[in-house]
């Protein structure tokens, strides 16, 4: 399947189930090659954050997309499946293309779709967890005082790709001691010391499905209040 790297993407779906992929200018061929839909459109609203000009591009429009899936009316109801992930640029482009449309939050539809997984989806998640588990085990075997947090992440990255992941499921991080106060964090050049508490969060992506494992590791003996907190 297709998922964008540094551009954005969207899927327009009509009430009768016809669908089209919408991608940014640099994902036209990539998107068409990797997605199962037979309709792919290039819209500047989905361009990357550096905001390139693309002077020779003749982009598609939301009208082109909607027409291709059988929608020609202008006074329509448009459901946005994730307001949280829809940029201002994309939202404004929809409003400008369909000024008479009623735009509503359709996030509940995605929640319902995600609530029940097909056997294929479960297979992707199981494979992702299998790979993430191997990465976790390999990092635990290799971790030692003197190694940096980033070196530990490097081990995990090597292992997930060696074992079949198409990408990291989420940005992987390994952080230690004071940084373990963070709910999420970025790995640093800090070197592990004896007695450190180290938090692993390692992941693998299979066909767009992300599986992540979080696990604490102690480089030594865990005692007192530290033991109470971790356990």
Spans of features found by a protein language model:
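Active-site neighborhoods and metal-handling regions in enzymes and metal-associated proteins
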Residues: 1-231
């Amino acid at each position: 399947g297709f998922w964008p790297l540094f551009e954005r993407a969207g899927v327009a779906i009509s009430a009768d189930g016809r669908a089209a992929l919408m991608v940014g200018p640099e994902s036209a061929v990539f998107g068409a090659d990797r997605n199962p839909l037979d309709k792919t459109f290039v819209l500047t609203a989905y361009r990357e954050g550096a905001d390139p000009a693309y002077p020779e591009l003749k982009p598609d429009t939301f009208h082109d997309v909607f027409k291709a899936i059988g929608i020609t009316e202008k006074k329509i109801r448009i459901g946005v499946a994730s307001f949280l992930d829809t940029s201002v640029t994309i939202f404004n482009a929809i409003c400008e293309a369909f000024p008479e449309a009623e735009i509503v939050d359709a996030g509940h539809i995605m929640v319902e779709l995600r609530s029940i997984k097909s056997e294929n989806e479960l297979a992707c998640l199981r494979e992702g967890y299998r790979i993430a588990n191997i990465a976790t085990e390999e990092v635990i075997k290799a971790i030692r005082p003197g190694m940096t947090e980033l070196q530990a992440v490097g081990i995990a990255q090597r292992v997930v790709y060696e074992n079949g992941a198409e990408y990291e499921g989420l940005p992987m991080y390994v952080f230690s001691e004071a940084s373990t106060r963070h709910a999420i964090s970025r790995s640093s050049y800090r070197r592990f010391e004896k007695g450190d508490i180290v938090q692993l969060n390692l992941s693998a992506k299979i066909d767009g499905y992300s599986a992540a494992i979080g696990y604490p590791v102690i480089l030594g003996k865990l005692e007192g209040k530290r033991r109470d907190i971790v356990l």
